Amino acid sequence: MKDLLNLLKNQGQVEEFDAIRIGLASPEMIRSWSFGEVKKPETINYRTFKPERDGLFCAKIFGPVKDYECLCGKYKRLKHRGVICEKCGVEVALAKVRRERMAHIELASPVAHIWFLKSLPSRIGLLMDMTLRDIERVLYFESYVVIDPGMTTLEKGQLLNDEQYFEALEEFGDDFDARMGAEAVRELLHAIDLEHEIGRLREEIPQTNSETKIKKLSKRLKLMEAFQGSGNLPEWMVLTVLPVLPPDLRPLVPLDGGRFATSDLNDLYRRVINRNNRLKRLLDLSAPDIIVRNEKRMLQEAVDALLDNGRRGRAITGSNKRPLKSLADMIKGKQGRFRQNLLGKRVDYSGRSVITVGPTLRLHQCGLPKKMALELFKPFIFGKLEMRGLATTIKAAKKMVERELPEVWDVLAEVIREHPVLLNRAPTLHRLGIQAFEPVLIEGKAIQLHPLVCAAYNADFDGDQMAVHVPLTLEAQLEARALMMSTNNILSPANGEPIIVPSQDVVLGLYYMTREAINAKGEGRVFADLQEVDRVFRAGEAALHAKVKVRINETVNDRDGGSVTNTRIVDTTVGRALLYQVVPKGLSYDVVNLPMKKKAISKLINQCYRVVGLKETVIFADQLMYTGFAYSTISGVSIGVNDFVIPDEKAQIIGAATDEVKEIESQYASGLVTQGEKYNKVIDLWSKANDEVSKAMMANLSKEKVIDRHGVEVDQESFNSMYMMADSGARGSAAQIRQLAGMRGLMAKPDGSIIETPITANFREGLSVLQYFISTHGARKGLADTALKTANSGYLTRRLVDVAQDLVVTEVDCGTEHGLLMTPHIEGGDVVEPLGERVLGRVIARDVFKPGTEEIIVPAGTLVDEKWVEFIELNSIDEVIVRSPISCETRYGICAKCYGRDLARGHQVNIGEAVGVIAAQSIGEPGTQLTMRTFHIGGAASRTSAADSVQVKNGGTVRLHNLKHVERVDGHLVAVSRSGELAIADDYGRERERYKLPYGAVISVKEGDKVDAGAIVAKWDPHTHPIVTEMKGTVTYVGMEEGITIKRQTDELTGMTNIEVLDAKDRPAAGKDIRPAVKMVDDNGKDLLLPGTDVIAQYFLPANALVGVADGAKIAIGDVIARIPQETSKTRDITGGLPRVADLFEARRPKEASILAEVSGTIAFGKETKGKRRLVITPNDGSDPYEELIPKWRHLNVFEGEQVNRGEVISDGPSDPHDILRLLGVSALAKYIVNEIQDVYRLQGVKINDKHIETILRQMLRKVEIAESGDSSFIKGDQMELTHVLVENERLGAEDKFVSKFTRVLLGITKASLSTESFISAASFQETTRVLTEAAVTGKRDYLRGLKENVVVGRLIPAGTGLAYHSERKRRRDADKPLRVSASEVEAALTEALNSSGN
């Protein structure tokens, strides 16, 4: 027995390891793995089913088929363990060894490994400096390659075809060596002297000038250094020995009827063995060259197919025309080893069933069917039955359970007590898709789910199914209870708002309960306390909606933990007083003294959580739910056709619109308007009519007439069922009601254009056949869109998770002072997101001063909570620098201070939180709600007149931001910069709105002026671009000759003459190179200089400019010299929704991106080329001018002689994130990407915290490009990990050497995932072959830092509770203790870590 125990112990021994290295296998290594050579292609004997000797399933090589029994049956039983049978040669062992023991095949001729040959860039090609095409010609026996030229005129590596080879033979005889096939390639690889080559390349690179050549050489150099550093030899890329997979991993299973099911690999191996044996025989017989060659080529092809079928030529197919699955196919793709078996395993102790609603459950409970519980908890029940002595053996216990004896149910109830189970609903889009509950046994077969967690699961009860999992170990139960219990997940990790929010019936009930009605029974009564209200209501003396006065005692908690009790009389309704009974102590009565709509309820729960804490909130949420259900039942709200009240005005509105349409039609018929104008007008008309109808309808629905208690008829908010549902937020919206009771409105064709005739009917009236047909388009497109959207959104989430999976909080504070400047987010002049909301839950990076003083009011390092937000708003601070994941300086991972608040818990984030995955889930989860389509700006939207003025919405004080301006004689300011902005601040100094001011805008207010709402503070002409003078003087024309460079036009209406500059291509030959300009001179005729420079003040005029001043005219500061007409902006498609988010995260360069100034300086135009303009920027510091060629059709925002700053827009268009990063830096990039992504989500009403987007951005900015290598081993132009470069630079700095210089690089998420340090993570993401090839050649080490790598190797992940385990293991290793870590030690370490992080 003791022997057996020892044996079992030995089986499970696993060496502890800290990294995994991948490399090339040498022939010796392959032979050392092997237990024998496979010589025959036979598999098993088809009569006896015994494996053939020396075949692919040979028991002598791979081990016995049955446990502890040799093949011939001479030795059986455990006592013969390790004996080798002398008859059949089989070792007596466990049959499991057939999964582990490998064999090999000695190849008669070397074979190139297809991965290193064909996976681009071809590694063999790079090393030998030959093209892939040439190598293939050698490998597949089409040409000879010279290996050793000897004393001849041939060169090493030269290709010879048959004729050339025979000519050379005749000429030189045996003086040279030229061969073909893989052995030739192997010889050449073997002959490479890595050290010598590396030295040669390092010398050659600095001496070459051509960019492409340097690129090629540095690629070779990198590969050679990789080979040198990894200990791989180049010739190992050519195989001489082929390893054979253990037979149980490629099984052969007999089916009934004498047929066999087999793995494809067996076919591929058989093919290789057959060809190899045939080749050996041919070589022994010394057959003619041509036959041997053919056989070698076939062997090469067979091995290619085994390693990666279909990579070269046509894939080898089986009997059923299906390509065979090769070794490479086994590991890649969704069904491959990585994604199917290592990252996604099926688990034991789980079940699934349909869900149904459990309105009587508490929040931490779920209803589990008895039958399911019995099956899931079987082992626990067996154990308990045996422990109780109710069953003598496990077998007896099993029988008892099968018979379902009464005592079994008692035991089950006991086993289940306090044993949480996990409920999961697919698709699990975020971490709230799996939560823990305490099971309650129920009859029936459906799982009961608490209604409030439906929002988190996105579940409904129309047939959804959910899976149940049982956490078995004590640690698992502990984590389920402490971390995953539904009561611990009240806030959403995406935005920190409650996710346990009542919806639908509950909202309706609470809304109905808190509405007020005029002249209800009991109106005007006064009650002494809440209990009295309750009694009177139950007695039926007062109606639920009656307006009454009640004396209340309330205890209000303030933010500092104190509380104030006071008594007052409030005007309220009976229902609200009843609702206040379930509100926890500490909240004021005002929270319920209003109609409880969905938003109000959400706010109430949030406030409750912040003020009175988790436990009270959970109890309160449950109470709210019970109350809501009760009162929505009492209310009897239901919908009948009569609730859809159609407004009386509808017929008249539609009649009027129809008449107008007829009028437009007749105009079109008589040719007064074009087809396009007619279409636009008609569509405008109908959308206006639709709005009017819906306005009338809502006005009609929302009010009803009642008699008050003085007998007067008054209006009150309606109790129409449909209106109440929409108003409370329970179900439906104004848009849907409009279709039911108003008119359906305009419909779109499948191509997105709008059909001119709207559907004037609504659903109550019913649609005609034509109307129904028109409306099917939209419905169909909607369904098709949804199907596509789900797949796209899932893929986006997968890429996000992959790029961010290894980002974990690893330390408390990285000590950086850097951060992002936060300002309110402004859109179209309005503040969409105030500063307070953006900094909530962030840590302040630098002290915040009281505006205008030196007094610090918020010290650096403060975690901003709701209390601080109010404080910041009160002190009218409008910009704060906060810590951000992007600027965090932690090496591996991120620090808690830079991340700030853990949104799902409401306090500073704990060490070990997997913030990367949370960010990915928060961004990916709402993906299915985003739209898929690109919006065409056309129809109503494109004709909105271009903005030509700034009109203030709120009154306040004017503030001008980085605005360069000149003051005109009349005191108005004229903007002479492009980046100026005008903001309006309120009395507290908080910014309320902000507007961009274009060049040439005339501003009628000054800094600090007070303005009223509605005032127009700036004006400009949107259709022309003015050239404004910045000084006074006299105008002189330069190079303006009529008929050659300019033409005069007279305006018919005004009779004024304008001078227009001719386009260069319309000028006669004499005027081609003349550049017309307007020069400023003083009264003596001397040239004036631009203020502050020594540049002559002359304004060059581009083509089509209109000059408005006469030669010799006197002008003042701020006058307009000329105007350049601007073609109205072309309508372009705006990519919205999911594709836009994907584009931003993939950092794609947009088409026709905006052009930014590369340097700060003065603009000039150089010589034009065909179709392009040459823009020259001369820097002010006297360095070399920067030139750029810009296509002529691009509209430029700048003109000659103007000053621009680095990164300013020269030509409009969508921004390119790479340009922003290069020219304006990381924080400008962060601001751009965060705002752009938020705009997309905001449009759908989805809230995501900025820090999640920043977290993903941090991962996209991991790489840097080396600009100067200094004394480091980096090569210029290399892309390296930022942390890696910083570590190296620290080392160089310490040794007083030159450090390397680098620029930051932005990678798209797919590229970033593939270029991680961990090859396991990258290989399991995409492009498995390429990643593994590269990793093997460079001998990469994976240090298992991320989550994915650890899941793949089957460890705890280094996040959450697993982080404690890993750090404890590391500490042990450093202390050289024995390496088994027990649960209790981890527990102790975890407690210590939690205490130190201040929890």
Curated annotation (Swiss-Prot):
Binding site for Zn(2+) 1: 70, 72, 85, 88
CC cofactor: Mg(2+); Zn(2+)
Single GO biological process annotation from the record: DNA-templated transcription
GO molecular function (one): zinc ion binding
Cofactor binding notes: Binds 1 Mg(2+) ion per subunit. Binds 2 Zn(2+) ions per subunit.
Residues engaged in binding Mg(2+): 460, 462, 464
Catalytic activity: RNA(n) + a ribonucleoside 5'-triphosphate = RNA(n+1) + diphosphate
UniProt superkingdom: Bacteria
Enzyme class label: transferase
Residues annotated for Zn(2+) 2 binding in this entry: 814, 888, 895, 898
InterPro entries: DNA-dir_RpoC_beta_prime, DNA-dir_RpoC_beta_prime_bact, RNA_pol_asu, RNA_pol_N, RNA_pol_Rpb1_1, RNA_pol_Rpb1_3, RNA_pol_Rpb1_3_sf, RNA_pol_Rpb1_4
Keywords: DNA-directed RNA polymerase, Magnesium, Metal-binding, Nucleotidyltransferase, Transcription, Transferase, Zinc
Protein EC: 2.7.7.6
UniProt xrefs under CDD domains: RNAP_beta'_C, RNAP_beta'_N
CC annotations in GO: DNA-directed RNA polymerase complex
Function of the protein: DNA-dependent RNA polymerase catalyzes the transcription of DNA into RNA using the four ribonucleoside triphosphates as substrates.
PANTHER family: DNA-DIRECTED RNA POLYMERASE, DNA-DIRECTED RNA POLYMERASE SUBUNIT BETA
HAMAP family (UniProt xref): RNApol_bact_RpoC (MF_01322)
Family as reported in the entry's similarity comment: Belongs to the RNA polymerase beta' chain family.
Quaternary structure and partners: The RNAP catalytic core consists of 2 alpha, 1 beta, 1 beta' and 1 omega subunit. When a sigma factor is associated with the core the holoenzyme is formed, which can initiate transcription.
NCBIfam families named in the record: rpoC_TIGR
Name of this chain's protein: DNA-directed RNA polymerase subunit beta'
Organism: Pseudomonas fluorescens (strain SBW25)
Lineage: Bacteria, Pseudomonadati, Pseudomonadota, Gammaproteobacteria, Pseudomonadales
